[in-house]
């Protein structure tokens, strides 16, 4: 029972152009991943890292942010270069000659505050949440991205999120607790078995136990875990290495949360 309609994305490899090219092609029954960025825009040497420049407290929509990053409009292309910022700080032509061209051409973003609106119709249509919980759906999710900069794989994660618009469920495998691994939306997760689904229902992280992320929808979770198959763990012929023991503790912890 393999789900060939599901697309698995290795977010570390998103930093490579060849991998993103693969994601944008249909594979088996899995539709392509949609993106605002063209191959040329995420090819090696382009948007490998973009810098934060604190110019505004305005909260941009995620779509506006991606337009800023991806637009081919000449006016935007010139204004988003770090060279433009240096000129606003009073740099003259002769001053810029001492600034590496790479730095001058680096893209910056003027605010780290983003807003991701929830398409409630798509949320229900795609089965992301139970229709009985429609009253819990938020209108938007506020995302605070780093005040340092973004690497290419992080840009593309935001890109995929924006373009998807809640048409396909998005899951995270867990195993990491870094905010960036969940696109800075750890308060909007739902534990489904061993994975975390992005849902438009806020569940704040418990500060006393920050490793227990996400809400649980009991009926769905119960249905999932009842399909798990176990065996041979009790055998004395099986060596349980440290990683295996860690995984078994995670499984037990998830079952404990359901109980």
Language-model regions, residue ranges each:
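ER/secretory pathway lumenal C-terminal domains and tails of membrane proteins involved
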Residues: 2-258
């Amino acid at each position: 029972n393999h789900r060939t309609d599901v697309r698995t994305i290795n977010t570390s490899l998103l930093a490579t152009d060849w991998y993103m090219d693969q994601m944008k092609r249909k594979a088996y029954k899995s539709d392509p991943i949609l993106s605002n960025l063209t191959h040329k825009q995420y090819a090696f040497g382009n948007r490998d890292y973009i810098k934060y420049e604190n110019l505004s407290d305005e909260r941009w929509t995620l779509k506006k942010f991606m337009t800023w990053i991806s637009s081919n409009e000449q006016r935007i292309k010139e204004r988003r270069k770090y060279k433009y910022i240096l000129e606003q700080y009073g740099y003259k032509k002769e001053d810029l000659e001492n600034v590496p061209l790479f730095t001058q051409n680096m893209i910056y973003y003027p605010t780290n505050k983003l807003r991701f609106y929830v398409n409630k119709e798509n949320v229900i249509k795609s089965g992301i949440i139970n229709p009985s919980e429609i009253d819990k759906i938020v209108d938007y999710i506020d995302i605070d991205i780093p005040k340092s900069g973004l690497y290419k794989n992080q840009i593309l994660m935001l890109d995929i999120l924006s373009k998807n618009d809640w048409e396909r469920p998005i899951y995270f495998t867990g195993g990491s607790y870094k905010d960036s691994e969940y696109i800075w939306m750890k308060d909007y997760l739902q534990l489904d078995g061993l994975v975390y689904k992005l849902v438009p229902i806020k569940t704040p992280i418990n500060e006393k136990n920050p490793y227990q992320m996400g809400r649980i929808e009991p009926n769905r979770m119960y249905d999932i875990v009842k399909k798990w198959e176990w065996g041979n763990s009790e055998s004395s012929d099986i060596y349980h290495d440290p990683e295996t023991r860690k995984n078994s503790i995670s499984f037990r912890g998830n079952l404990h949360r359901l109980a």
